[in-house]
């Protein structure tokens, strides 16, 4: 695993990488799951503080606003697919199972979201909501080779791999 008391610069770096990968994994997971929860009213009704949608119907309308260039008939399907993807990615990242793949797909999903936000609402929208930063973080997580406190780590350790 890793030592909690670094004895040299390499140990300190390993601790920082391990902490960062766990922190980033959880931050992305909870961000995906929180956004999904908002669509189903878990955080309250539309108009309440920190509630973006409050209902799935409002999220579908927002999906249509961002994807104005797509045929209207595809918007509900896109909203459902993106919600399913965010739910699955959120749980995969939370558990640390197939972490690299989940992080890569999460980075792509967030990048597409940032691009459509910029096209529909202007460049400040994805910048103000740190969507490009989250996408970059997901891509960085996908580049990690170790995932402490994860199913991936448990599976690797139980298989005897180094």
Predicted segment positions?
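Extended, low-polarity transmembrane helix blocks
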Residues: 1-58, 65-68, 72-88, 95-162
């Amino acid at each position: 695993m890793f030592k909690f008391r670094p004895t040299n610069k390499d140990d300190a770096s390993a601790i920082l990488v391990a902490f960062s990968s766990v922190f980033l994994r959880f931050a992305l997971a909870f961000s995906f799951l929180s956004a999904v929860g908002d669509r189903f009213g878990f955080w309250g009704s539309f108009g309440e503080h920190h509630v973006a949608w409050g209902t799935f119907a409002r999220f579908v309308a927002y999906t249509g606003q961002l994807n104005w260039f797509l045929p209207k008939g595809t918007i509900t399907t896109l909203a459902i697919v993106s919600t399913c993807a965010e739910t699955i990615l959120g749980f995969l990242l939370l558990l640390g199972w197939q972490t690299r793949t989940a992080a890569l797909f999460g980075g792509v999903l967030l990048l597409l979201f940032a691009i459509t936000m910029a096209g529909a609402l202007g460049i400040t929208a994805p910048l103000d909501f740190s969507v490009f930063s989250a996408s970059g973080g997901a891509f960085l997580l996908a580049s990690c080779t170790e995932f402490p406190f994860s199913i991936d780590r448990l599976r690797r350790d139980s298989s005897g791999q180094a």
